[in-house]
């Protein structure tokens, strides 16, 4: 019997006296077919290391451990650590790290894999309230993850895969699409979770590009500029840039020059700029030494 079997899940929770904490956004998956589909979507095999975020009681971890070289699972809730030690006892290729993934030094952590040079894929069922910070943390870690296969609310998946001139488009769209392609693989109904969330989820598969979608002089500055443009979505690009960089005559002259170099109108909003537009703007701002 699988951990994800509903009767097994309930028995594990009862045996350990576990109660769900809303603050951790805990929803445990109880459908083995969907778990297998996640592993198949991520194309997990013995040539891959996996980082899992939020293993819960180990339902997905069990499937990952059977297929991957190694699994490193980050769990913030210390009440789940003894449960995972119990449910995953038969595996010698799983490390459970009792830590908030947002506070983890991932560059150091991945050295704990027996073979840290294998491609690393991230597989996770992320709580809605923290999906964006976690994805940004993973991207900003500069670790060349091969793939993210992540369960999330459809609204967040729409933001990640959004195109310019849409409500969903923003700095998250740019950050992910700069490095990766993003595509919804399938829908996960709310009925297969304990407890059931309020909405259905989707599995979003993000695959690293061979090269970033555009070339920029300074990646960190490029991402900074893209974030600045969306600080106040309803404001013009000019207003957001001057709010961030300053409103002195010298600064405004440099901003005008940079926009002229990048061939971008100051009156448009950030959501109208494509990723190549943001690349041109960031490089132009560097050129004028803002």
From Swiss-Prot:
Keywords: Cytoplasm, Methyltransferase, RNA-binding, rRNA processing, S-adenosyl-L-methionine, Transferase. The keyword Cell wall biogenesis/degradation does not apply. Belongs to the class I-like SAM-binding methyltransferase superfamily. rRNA adenine N(6)-methyltransferase family. RsmA subfamily. It is found in: Cytoplasm. PROSITE patterns: RRNA_A_DIMETH (PS01131), SAM_RNA_A_N6_MT (PS51689). It holds the Pfam family RrnaAD. S-adenosyl-L-methionine binds at residues 27, 29, 54, 75, 100, 125. This is Ribosomal RNA small subunit methyltransferase A. Its EC number is 2.1.1.182. It catalyses: adenosine(1518)/adenosine(1519) in 16S rRNA + 4 S-adenosyl-L-methionine = N(6)-dimethyladenosine(1518)/N(6)-dimethyladenosine(1519) in 16S rRNA + 4 S-adenosyl-L-homocysteine + 4 H(+). It is an enzyme of class 2 (transferase).
